[in-house]
Amino acid sequence: MASNGGSCPSSGGHMNGYPVPHYAFFFPHMLGGLSPPGSLAGIPHPLPVSAYSTPSPATIETQSTSSEEIVPSPPSPPPLPRIYKPCFVCQDKSSGYHYGVSACEGCKGFFRRSIQKNMVYTCHRDKTCIINKVTRNRCQYCRLQKCFEVGMSKESVRNDRNKKKKQEAPKQECTESYIITPEVEDLVEKVRKAHQETFPALCQLGKYTTNNSSEERVSLDIDLWDKFSELSTKCIIKTVEFAKQLPGFTTLTIADQITLLKAACLDILILRICTRYTPDQDTMTFSDGLTLNRTQMHNAGFGPLTDLVFAFANQLLPLEMDDAETGLLSAICLICGDRQDLEQPDKVDKLQEPLLEALKIYVRKRRPNKPHMFPKMLMKITDLRSISAKGAERVITLKMEIPGSMPPLIQEMLENSEGLDSLTGQPPRASSLAPPPGSCSPSLSPSSNRSSPTSHSP
């Protein structure tokens, strides 16, 4: 069939015996790129190109013959997947070139870990073990030697590790920014000293025990209660001494000092006794060395509060808090602007801010690989408040169980813990801790309270 080499779309030519307009002539500039070189140059144009012109029979014949020659090219086949040589180490299927050779994922990871961790392996045979995909895990020494023999590069692993270090650099900079400034260090040391001077560590105490009701829970053991109430009174006095040593505490109004002490005293007492918990023996030790087991603590007056306190003590163990952290957490519990009835809550908040910052920096500096330890410690304050609320209720029920009256300092500091007055339905009483006119701090001190009775049981 004759052809003049024209290039036309298949829509041109005859359709059911009727001529069909050839649209290639309307848009020659659009189709020129699809035509072979010179294919349109030799085509005569017998009529002027017009939107309404009809091609001549000769032109139709030319279009018909040329349209039969256009065959759409088949789609190009997809590229063949890249095929790597088997793993040079174990002959398993390779996943690509790793550290200089074709290797499988298993050998790649083994080599990387071995180099990064400076692993030293031992062969239990003659150092000629066969390494293939079945035996590769049997001898790490020979597998590593095979990696070196086939050309795996230590430097490639180190370079890869350096790239990751650069990517992680911003995180490292954030960690390194927690440096202890002289101001923070001074605050930490003052709080640590205040804590240590008012609360000796467990290792400094000569522990002793008692056989009183050590095996069976009872509602109240009077002898244990007498001892417990005496020790509790001394602990309250030490808590007040601790507060007076905290920077800025005595600059607060007398009313706010008393409000904060009464609201947080039980929090601090519970936190302190829980740091003297011995998990192996399930005992707690008081400041004079008296060591009580769980049953004895219950019978001494803790009652239904006992298991809550011991559970909290167990939760503190993973934190491994030192004296500075315990002191700072106690100070944060005490100096807290959200307590009820404060005259200057904003001033209290400002005093608390450096304590929070000091604890955060100290904890993160001491545990650089445990960034979540600081928020975990702060969450313990919520737990302490929950236990303290139940402890304040326990003081009320104890008044009905003990013979005689409650020791005045325990009743004053613990029964009137925050929120308890609304629970009892009674208005707050005037505090016996109120200092004389002109005093700059609460009048409560060891010298002024040692003469007060510590037990009123018969």
From Swiss-Prot:
Region ranges (Hinge): 153-182
Tissues where the protein occurs: Expressed in forelimb, in the distal forelimb blastema, kidney, liver and hindlimb blastemal mesenchymal cells.
UniProt keyword Zinc-finger present: yes
ZnF NR C4-type: positions: 87-107, 123-147
CDD domains: NR_DBD_RAR, NR_LBD_RAR
GO molecular function, one term: nuclear receptor activity
GO biological process, one term: retinoic acid receptor signaling pathway
InterPro entries in UniProt: NHR-like_dom_sf, NR_DBD_RAR, NR_LBD_RAR, Nucl_hrmn_rcpt_lig-bd, Nuclear_hrmn_rcpt, Retinoic_acid_rcpt, Znf_hrmn_rcpt, Znf_NHR/GATA
PROSITE patterns referenced in this protein's UniProt entry, alphabetically: NR_LBD, NUCLEAR_REC_DBD_1, NUCLEAR_REC_DBD_2
Domain of life: Eukaryota
Claim: Zinc is one of the keywords in the record: yes
Gene Ontology cellular-component annotations: nucleus; transcription regulator complex
Subunit composition and interactions: Heterodimer; with an rxr molecule. Binds DNA preferentially as a rar/rxr heterodimer.
The family this protein is said to belong to: Belongs to the nuclear hormone receptor family. NR1 subfamily.
Notes on the domains: Composed of three domains: a modulating N-terminal domain, a DNA-binding domain and a C-terminal ligand-binding domain. The 9aaTAD motif is a transactivation domain present in a large number of yeast and animal transcription factors.
Protein name from the UniProt record: Retinoic acid receptor alpha
Source organism of this protein record: Notophthalmus viridescens (Eastern newt)
